[in-house]
């Protein structure tokens, strides 16, 4: 159970962190252009 939970959290962070980074980068480029 514990290992599964840790793996789930790790995979969730592995997906969320780059996604948030790309969104922030995308918003930043849009603001600078406009």
UniProtKB/Swiss-Prot annotation:
GO cellular-component term (any): photosystem II
Keyword Transmembrane attributed: yes
Major subcellular site: membrane
Keywords, alphabetical: Membrane, Photosynthesis, Photosystem II, Reaction center, Thylakoid, Transmembrane, Transmembrane helix
Pfam families xref list: PsbM
GO biological process: photosynthesis, light reaction
Signal peptide per UniProt: none
Sequence intervals crossing the membrane: 7-27
Annotated compartments: Cellular thylakoid membrane
Family: Belongs to the PsbM family.
Function recorded in the entry: One of the components of the core complex of photosystem II (PSII). PSII is a light-driven water:plastoquinone oxidoreductase that uses light energy to abstract electrons from H(2)O, generating O(2) and a proton gradient subsequently used for ATP formation. It consists of a core antenna complex that captures photons, and an electron transfer chain that converts photonic excitation into a charge separation. This subunit is found at the monomer-monomer interface.
HAMAP family assigned: PSII_PsbM
Subunit comment: PSII is composed of 1 copy each of membrane proteins PsbA, PsbB, PsbC, PsbD, PsbE, PsbF, PsbH, PsbI, PsbJ, PsbK, PsbL, PsbM, PsbT, PsbX, PsbY, PsbZ, Psb30/Ycf12, peripheral proteins PsbO, CyanoQ (PsbQ), PsbU, PsbV and a large number of cofactors. It forms dimeric complexes.
UniProt name for this protein: Photosystem II reaction center protein M
Organism expressing this protein natively: Parasynechococcus marenigrum (strain WH8102)
